[in-house]
UniProtKB/Swiss-Prot annotation:
Organism for this UniProt entry: Puumala virus (strain Udmurtia/894CG/91)
Uppermost EC category: hydrolase
Region (Interaction with glycoprotein N) residue spans: 80-248
Cellular component terms (Gene Ontology): helical viral capsid; host cell Golgi apparatus; host cell perinuclear region of cytoplasm; ribonucleoprotein complex; viral nucleocapsid
Chain residue ranges for the region called Viral panhandle binding: 1-175
Compositionally skewed regions (Basic and acidic residues) per UniProt: 67-78
The protein's name in its UniProt record: Nucleoprotein
Site location (Important for the endonuclease activity): 88, 103
Any matching Pfam family: Hanta_nucleocap
Length: 433
């Protein structure tokens, strides 16, 4: 289809089909006005879809035509014998060859990449959808996230579900949930949903629904998240009653021993930290929290809530804004991101390869999480992360899934049987199971 003549013929054919389709659409609209029954409404919907599809195809062919014309101009352009492009400022040719032309027309420098998202607008948009389509989209972007992103990179995808629709003049139309799948060069607008922003906002708004359906990202599954959240209320209660190494209470003479004991607990340190967080609120995030509180969302208001750790079940790349002012929550997410880095470091260490190849397999989830969360207006308390690591670190590392589920004794027995059989039938060295 690279030939200009063929493309022009396709454009002409599609333009003719579009004229006919638009006329049929007008006839269908008139029929619905006269008799708005189901048959006429379905016909109208089909006509609208046909027109939309033809418009998309026509636009695509016109883009192809523009590209083909541009290529033809480049091919016919006389080449400079010196090998220097006409608009290059160098007087002598560079030792480097000319590379790709990077088109920056689409970039808006008023909204640079990496900016803080407009969480209020994003939250209001997501809350406007039904729970089923939100959770199904979350499943596609977390449990099956790698596959979905790979198949749709560089496009703006639409999620569709029968539970999500809107009535326009009595006609039921699908209400699509839009998510942008950026490449490394993409510039995202403040209110634009990306997979990372979507996981962040949905995990923060609907942790109870995520818990009930057990939706979990693979990167959380392999660090033993299921084990960690199994008895969360008891786990966090025991943690709060432990002695905090960072507190040295000023005790007045005659203070009861029981009160002195209480003042040394982690709970008191968390109460002090909550006072600091209460002074650092951002207006837009407060507005989002108030808006969410008036609807269906189930954001935790305390780290001891049963659904609190489920905020991180789908591995959001930062602390969700709806619970960023709940003491200990942002640090809990940081603890999970460190565990992910620890597991990846273990996996990289046990693989065969050069030091450089092993380094490539390491990750920096923690640094990314820290940077993104702090861009939302709070500083993480490293001491709380340290308390989590001291309390649960060893236990969690023992529950990592390291891709080696075979019992050592079983592996040894199987290997000895392989060695014996290979020696019977061959003089080659047996491979390791």
């Amino acid at each position: 289809m690279s030939d200009l003549t063929d493309i022009q013929e396709e454009i002409t054919r599609h333009e003719q089909q579009l004229v006919v389709a638009r006329q049929k659409l007008k006839d269908a609209e008139r029929a619905v006005e006269v008799d708005p029954d189901d048959v006429n409404k379905n016909t109208l919907q089909a006509r609208q879809q046909t027109v939309s599809a033809l418009e998309d195809k026509l636009a695509d062919y016109k883009r192809r035509m523009a590209d083909a014309v541009s290529r033809k101009k480049m091919d016919t352009k006389p080449t400079d014998p010196t090998g220097i492009e006409p608009d290059d400022h160098l007087k002598e040719r560079s030792s480097l060859r000319y590379g790709n032309v990077l088109d920056v027309n689409a970039i808006d420098i008023e909204e640079p990449s990496g900016q803080t998202a407009d969480w209020y607008t994003i939250g209001v948009y997501v809350i406007g959808f039904t729970i089923p389509i939100i959770l199904k989209a979350l499943y596609m972007l977390s449990t099956r996230g790698r596959q979905t992103v790979k198949e749709n990179k560089g496009t703006r995808i639409r999620f569709k579900d029968d539970t999500s629709f809107e009535d326009i003049n009595g006609i039921r139309r699908p209400k699509h949930l839009y998510v942008s799948m950026p490449t490394a060069q993409s510039t995202m607008k403040a209110e634009e949903l990306t997979p990372g922003r979507f996981r962040t906002i949905v995990c923060g708004l609907f942790p109870t629904q995520i818990q009930v359906r057990n939706i979990m990202s693979p990167v959380m599954g392999v660090i033993g998240f299921s084990f960690f959240v199994k008895d969360w209320p008891e786990r966090i209660r025991d943690f709060m009653e432990k002695e905090c190494p960072f507190i040295k209470p000023e005790v007045k003479p005659g203070t009861p021993a029981q009160e002195i004991e209480f003042l040394k607990r982690n709970r008191v340190y968390f109460m002090t930290r909550q006072d600091v967080l209460d002074k650092n609120h951002v207006a837009d995030i407060d507005k989002l929290i108030d808006y969410a509180a008036s609807g269906d969302p189930t954001s935790p208001d305390d780290i001891e809530s049963p659904n609190a750790p489920w905020v991180f079940a789908c591995a959001p790349d930062r602390c969700p804004p709806t619970c960023i002012y709940v003491v200990g929550m942002a640090e809990l997410g940081a603890f999970f991101s460190i565990l992910q880095d620890m597991r990846n470091t273990i996996m990289a260490s046990k693989t065969v390869g050069t030091a450089e190849e092993k380094l490539k397999k390491k990750s920096s989830f923690y640094q990314s999480y820290l940077r993104r969360t702090q861009s939302m207006g709070i500083q993480l308390d490293q001491r709380i992360i340290l308390l989590y690591m001291l309390e649960w670190g060893k236990e969690m590392v023992d529950h990592f899934h390291l891709g080696d589920d075979m019992d050592p004794e079983l592996r040894g027995l199987a290997q000895s049987l392989i060695d014996q059989k290979v020696k019977e039938i061959s003089n080659q060295e047996p491979l390791k199971i």
